[in-house]
Amino acid sequence: MMSLRICLLATCLLVAAHASKDASNDRLKPTKWLTATELENVPSLNDITWERLENQPLEQGAKVIEKIYHVGQIKHDLTPSFVPSPSNVPVWIIKSNGQKVECKLNNYVETAKAQPGFGEDEVTIVLTGLPKTSPAQQKAMRRLIQAYVQKYNLQQLQKNAQEQQQQLKSSDYDYTSSEEAADQWKSAKAASGDLIIIDLGSTLTNFKRYAMLDVLNTGAMIGQTLIDLTNKGVPQEIIHLIGQGISAHVAGAAGNKYTAQTGHKLRRITGLDPAKVLSKRPQILGGLSRGDADFVDAIHTSTFAMGTPIRCGDVDFYPNGPSTGVPGSENVIEAVARATRYFAESVRPGSERNFPAVPANSLKQYKEQDGFGKRAYMGLQIDYDLRGDYILEVNAKSPFGQRSPAHKQAAYHGMHHAQN
């Protein structure tokens, strides 16, 4: 009798386990995420073009990306397969005067080291992640390069500002924005360094290549060049790696490759709107995350479109809170590029504190001054001890930063005054 009860119990457990497995599998069916009509209307990767995404309204383009992402995550039918050839990846070494030295990924280390003074100060390496044909991308990269040229030419700018102020003292000119900029440059810190643009985005000539990019292997390829740089005398402590969109994850993989082979970490990796990874290998973790460098920060500008809502760094900034796109972005590509525009603005001398932010879980909490912790500044001059999620408000047009101080929460504000 006892053995019969045991058999019945075992049978019930097996049935329950099987039912639970069926229920779990049922939850993973695409029809549980999308309607049958929506599934039928999910376009293939070959049907999506960059031009189409730029011409579609932001919300419409975001829905297309979301559908592809969810179906791919459930069906696991998108396996990364595209790794650009190093000889096909353009690289530009930007001199302090703005002049570009063009080379390729397979020879940029030697070309860079041949430049006078290269690697004596900070080295900033930017991995693009959007097609170079995009007007939004062209403008974003132009602004970023201009900002770094200004930063590395600050001593000359300060000299020019002093001369300009001397001329204005003997005139009746009104105080204008150019004079205000001159005052900002006077108080900014002088710095020098080198800027390298690895134009990975130029190899993403169509959306399918973008979706099928092998982040891990491409990152390992980039990481090897960073190892070559340090082997030629460039300390990892002065390297700042910046990844845009999908290339934010490439930057993370590059950092992992560097650490695995050298036992050291890069000083900093910044993700400019880290993307949703549309294709990945099952059971393999990937993507930008804490630990890929000594310090990892990310700016999210299209969390519900091409960007990911997942925390990627030691500190993550969400301008205007997690959203499809930040104010002023009209399509999904422009929404991604805005993170680059924001970062560029923070690089420009005198604008380092244009983006005050506070720790908060939502824009509503931020506006109600119900956040927690102290104010911080998004962008280049970030404090490396920051941790958590930060919210801030931005303008729809340039200048994007709202220079007025971010909200101080009641608790922190009171504690601050009590200490002073």
Curated annotation (Swiss-Prot):
The modification Phosphothreonine is found at T37. Residues 401-420 are annotated as: Disordered. Synthesized in the fat body and ovarian follicle cells and accumulate in the oocyte. InterPro entries: AB_hydrolase_fold, Lipase, TAG_lipase. One of its GO terms (biological process) is response to bacterium. Disruption phenotype: Viable, even in combination with null mutations in Yp1 and Yp2. Its main location: secreted. The modification Phosphoserine is found at S177, S178. It is found in: Secreted. Residues 1-19 form the signal peptide. Tyrosine sulfation occurs in the female only and plays an essential functional role. Pfam families: Lipase. GO terms for molecular function: serine hydrolase activity. Induction: By beta-ecdysone; in males. The keyword Flavoprotein does not apply. The modification Sulfotyrosine is found at Y384, Y390. SUPFAM superfamilies: alpha/beta-Hydrolases. Vitellogenin is the major yolk protein of eggs where it is used as a food source during embryogenesis. Vitellogenins and their receptor yl/yolkless are required for maintenance of microtubule plus-end orientation towards the posterior pole of oocytes. Involved in polarized localization of germ plasm components, such as osk mRNA and vas protein, to the oocyte posterior cortex. Receptor-mediated endocytosis by yl/yolkless is crucial for actin reorganization, mediated by osk isoform A/Long, required to anchor germ plasm components to the oocyte cortex. Belongs to the AB hydrolase superfamily. Lipase family. This is Vitellogenin-3. The gene is Yp3.
